[in-house]
């Protein structure tokens, strides 16, 4: 079809004018829309960080009552997860430093300072191989997961979905237990091992997980008490699934770890107990001190501060002893106070005694002797 050239030129011109107008309007709208201020940037960043942190640490989500990730258990001591945490930390540290602190409110400045401090502390911690010490007698997934799987902890077991979520978490536990062996072998090679007394206490904890039948396992407890929300068909299916998981996956994984600790790791444990005895241990311990106290004081300085504070407080107590006229040493004064405290009736008894005194005063004011003070003859008198 033939179209005259002048018409085409007119159409193109109109289109160009329209496009230019639209761009100008868009620019005007952008100019009218204010950029988020520093406070809004900070709040949005903190919200995003918390959400991403929950995804990387789903157990935290469970413990704070957020059920979205109850089916997840990452291999937190594995290289991939540790790399994800490291990358996330660096990304948010850079974003936080880009915020104009001078434009923040006083409260937001504190939030910003704390956030940056925590990111810097996490970066500093990368120097120290905590992941090579994944198992101890006081913590770690080896003891936490049985507690969660007992059905009496933060992990919910109220619906069919809850039961299925836990099965998926058990898969993650098996992966974690095997990763622990890999990491601890690396720790042996690098001289980063637990003290022997610690692992001697770990062995019976691991041994307690090695049951012959699923019914004897802590992890079996939830299927003993299904809630009404779980149908009979699902109960039967889930009971079989839990039995398979416990006997076929979880118990064998615990056995592998127990055997490794007993046969390979325990002979390589250290006779020392101080953290400073580890490779780079002095700096490692100093890092922990700073992390838990948020000061730049050394361990020796903190220890000395504690000694001086105890001396100061004891001096104050001794002045009180002198003020009340107690004739004896300070230790005897402490004993005296404990004995006196033991003789003080509990609040309920003091309240009853006070009410009795109050009734007595009321009777006396009305010309009536309290019953406790009347004689038998008086009570019989008209």
PLM feature spans:
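N-terminal maturation segment of proteins
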Residues: 25-382
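Bacterial N-terminal signal peptides
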Residues: 7-18
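N-terminal secretory signal peptides that target proteins for export/translocation
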Residues: 1-4
